[in-house]
Amino acid sequence: MATSFTDYLKQVKAGIREVSVHDLAEMQAKVKDLTVIDVREPDEQDNGVILGAKLVPRGFLEQRIEQIQPDRAAPLALYCASGNRSALSAKNLAELGYTNVVSVSGGVSAWSRAGLELDHPKRLTREQTARYARQTILPQIGEVGQTKLLNAKVLVVGAGGLGSPTALYL
Protein backbone atom coordinates (compact mmCIF):
# COMPACT_ATOMS: atom_id res chain seq x y z
CA MET A 1 0.00 0.00 0.00
CA ALA A 2 1.32 3.44 -0.98
CA THR A 3 2.13 5.71 1.95
CA SER A 4 2.76 8.92 0.00
CA PHE A 5 2.11 10.37 -3.43
CA THR A 6 5.68 9.52 -4.43
CA ASP A 7 5.14 5.90 -3.43
CA TYR A 8 1.81 5.83 -5.25
CA LEU A 9 3.36 7.30 -8.41
CA LYS A 10 6.14 4.69 -8.34
CA GLN A 11 3.50 1.99 -7.99
CA VAL A 12 1.51 3.43 -10.93
CA LYS A 13 4.60 3.71 -13.14
CA ALA A 14 5.53 0.11 -12.35
CA GLY A 15 2.16 -0.97 -13.73
CA ILE A 16 2.19 0.96 -17.02
CA ARG A 17 4.46 1.17 -20.06
CA GLU A 18 6.66 4.26 -20.38
CA VAL A 19 8.55 5.30 -23.50
CA SER A 20 11.25 7.90 -24.08
CA VAL A 21 10.68 10.99 -26.22
CA HIS A 22 12.89 9.42 -28.90
CA ASP A 23 10.73 6.29 -28.82
CA LEU A 24 7.64 8.48 -29.29
CA ALA A 25 9.22 10.31 -32.25
CA GLU A 26 9.98 6.93 -33.82
CA MET A 27 6.44 5.69 -33.11
CA GLN A 28 4.99 8.80 -34.78
CA ALA A 29 6.97 8.00 -37.92
CA LYS A 30 6.22 4.26 -37.97
CA VAL A 31 2.86 3.61 -36.25
CA LYS A 32 0.17 4.71 -38.68
CA ASP A 33 -2.82 4.86 -36.31
CA LEU A 34 -1.02 6.25 -33.24
CA THR A 35 -3.04 8.83 -31.30
CA VAL A 36 -0.91 11.24 -29.24
CA ILE A 37 -2.73 13.05 -26.42
CA ASP A 38 -1.48 16.06 -24.44
CA VAL A 39 -3.09 15.88 -20.98
CA ARG A 40 -1.76 19.25 -19.78
CA GLU A 41 -3.98 22.23 -18.98
CA PRO A 42 -4.63 24.79 -21.76
CA ASP A 43 -2.34 27.46 -20.28
CA GLU A 44 0.54 24.94 -20.25
CA GLN A 45 -0.11 24.09 -23.89
CA ASP A 46 0.64 27.69 -24.85
CA ASN A 47 4.35 26.84 -24.47
CA GLY A 48 4.12 24.35 -27.32
CA VAL A 49 2.67 20.94 -28.08
CA ILE A 50 4.01 17.87 -29.83
CA LEU A 51 2.99 17.96 -33.50
CA GLY A 52 -0.26 16.13 -34.17
CA ALA A 53 -1.25 15.80 -30.52
CA LYS A 54 -4.87 16.02 -29.44
CA LEU A 55 -5.27 18.50 -26.61
CA VAL A 56 -7.34 16.98 -23.80
CA PRO A 57 -6.72 18.18 -20.23
CA ARG A 58 -6.37 15.30 -17.76
CA GLY A 59 -9.60 16.24 -15.99
CA PHE A 60 -11.58 15.51 -19.18
CA LEU A 61 -9.64 12.57 -20.62
CA GLU A 62 -11.80 9.75 -19.29
CA GLN A 63 -14.96 11.58 -20.42
CA ARG A 64 -13.69 12.25 -23.95
CA ILE A 65 -11.50 9.26 -24.77
CA GLU A 66 -14.25 7.28 -26.50
CA GLN A 67 -14.87 10.20 -28.87
CA ILE A 68 -11.15 10.57 -29.56
CA GLN A 69 -10.36 6.86 -29.92
CA PRO A 70 -13.22 4.36 -29.61
CA ASP A 71 -10.94 1.39 -30.44
CA ARG A 72 -9.60 0.17 -27.10
CA ALA A 73 -6.77 -1.75 -28.82
CA ALA A 74 -5.49 1.25 -30.83
CA PRO A 75 -2.10 2.68 -29.84
CA LEU A 76 -2.26 5.74 -27.58
CA ALA A 77 0.65 7.86 -26.32
CA LEU A 78 -0.01 10.27 -23.46
CA TYR A 79 2.23 13.08 -22.32
CA CYS A 80 2.19 15.98 -19.87
CA ALA A 81 4.90 18.36 -18.66
CA SER A 82 7.02 15.78 -16.82
CA GLY A 83 5.45 12.35 -17.26
CA ASN A 84 3.60 12.10 -13.94
CA ARG A 85 0.06 13.11 -14.97
CA SER A 86 0.38 11.10 -18.18
CA ALA A 87 1.34 8.03 -16.12
CA LEU A 88 -1.73 8.47 -13.93
CA SER A 89 -3.85 8.97 -17.06
CA ALA A 90 -2.39 5.82 -18.65
CA LYS A 91 -3.40 3.84 -15.57
CA ASN A 92 -6.94 5.23 -15.76
CA LEU A 93 -7.27 4.39 -19.46
CA ALA A 94 -6.03 0.86 -18.79
CA GLU A 95 -8.76 0.54 -16.16
CA LEU A 96 -11.25 1.63 -18.85
CA GLY A 97 -10.07 -1.23 -21.06
CA TYR A 98 -7.49 0.49 -23.29
CA THR A 99 -4.76 -2.08 -23.84
CA ASN A 100 -2.11 -0.25 -25.89
CA VAL A 101 -1.36 2.90 -23.88
CA VAL A 102 2.06 4.39 -23.19
CA SER A 103 3.15 7.37 -21.12
CA VAL A 104 6.00 9.55 -22.34
CA SER A 105 8.72 9.63 -19.69
CA GLY A 106 9.83 13.19 -18.97
CA GLY A 107 6.91 14.63 -20.93
CA VAL A 108 7.12 17.70 -23.12
CA SER A 109 10.00 19.03 -21.02
CA ALA A 110 12.17 16.09 -22.12
CA TRP A 111 10.88 16.48 -25.70
CA SER A 112 11.99 20.11 -25.72
CA ARG A 113 15.37 19.34 -24.09
CA ALA A 114 15.96 16.72 -26.79
CA GLY A 115 15.55 19.45 -29.42
CA LEU A 116 12.48 17.84 -30.98
CA GLU A 117 9.98 20.06 -32.80
CA LEU A 118 7.06 21.66 -30.98
CA ASP A 119 3.97 23.20 -32.53
CA HIS A 120 2.60 26.49 -31.18
CA PRO A 121 -1.09 26.42 -32.09
CA LYS A 122 -3.06 29.64 -32.08
CA ARG A 123 -5.45 29.72 -29.13
CA LEU A 124 -8.63 31.66 -28.52
CA THR A 125 -8.37 34.79 -26.38
CA ARG A 126 -10.42 35.04 -23.19
CA GLU A 127 -12.95 37.23 -25.01
CA GLN A 128 -13.19 34.80 -27.94
CA THR A 129 -13.61 31.89 -25.54
CA ALA A 130 -16.59 33.64 -23.95
CA ARG A 131 -18.09 34.70 -27.30
CA TYR A 132 -17.82 31.28 -28.94
CA ALA A 133 -18.57 29.15 -25.86
CA ARG A 134 -21.64 27.58 -27.48
CA GLN A 135 -19.58 26.26 -30.40
CA THR A 136 -16.47 25.20 -28.53
CA ILE A 137 -18.40 22.84 -26.25
CA LEU A 138 -19.55 20.86 -29.30
CA PRO A 139 -17.17 17.94 -29.93
CA GLN A 140 -17.59 18.43 -33.69
CA ILE A 141 -16.21 21.99 -33.50
CA GLY A 142 -14.25 22.54 -30.30
CA GLU A 143 -11.58 25.18 -29.92
CA VAL A 144 -9.56 23.87 -32.86
CA GLY A 145 -12.54 24.13 -35.22
CA GLN A 146 -13.45 27.59 -33.97
CA THR A 147 -9.87 28.75 -34.51
CA LYS A 148 -10.06 27.47 -38.10
CA LEU A 149 -13.30 29.42 -38.59
CA LEU A 150 -11.66 32.58 -37.25
CA ASN A 151 -8.80 32.17 -39.71
CA ALA A 152 -11.14 31.51 -42.65
CA LYS A 153 -12.66 34.01 -45.01
CA VAL A 154 -16.43 33.52 -45.02
CA LEU A 155 -19.08 35.03 -47.28
CA VAL A 156 -22.64 34.73 -46.00
CA VAL A 157 -25.27 35.30 -48.69
CA GLY A 158 -28.99 35.18 -47.98
CA ALA A 159 -28.63 33.09 -44.85
CA GLY A 160 -31.61 33.34 -42.54
CA GLY A 161 -34.36 35.89 -42.44
CA LEU A 162 -34.85 39.18 -40.68
CA GLY A 163 -33.53 39.02 -37.17
CA SER A 164 -31.67 35.76 -37.82
CA PRO A 165 -28.24 35.90 -36.15
CA THR A 166 -26.65 33.47 -38.64
CA ALA A 167 -23.32 35.28 -38.92
CA LEU A 168 -23.11 36.12 -35.22
CA TYR A 169 -20.88 33.12 -34.53
CA LEU A 170 -18.41 33.68 -37.37
Model-derived features with residue positions:
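Conserved beta-strand elements of the Class I
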Residues: 35-37, 77, 155
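Glycine-rich adenosine-cofactor-binding loop
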Residues: 142-170
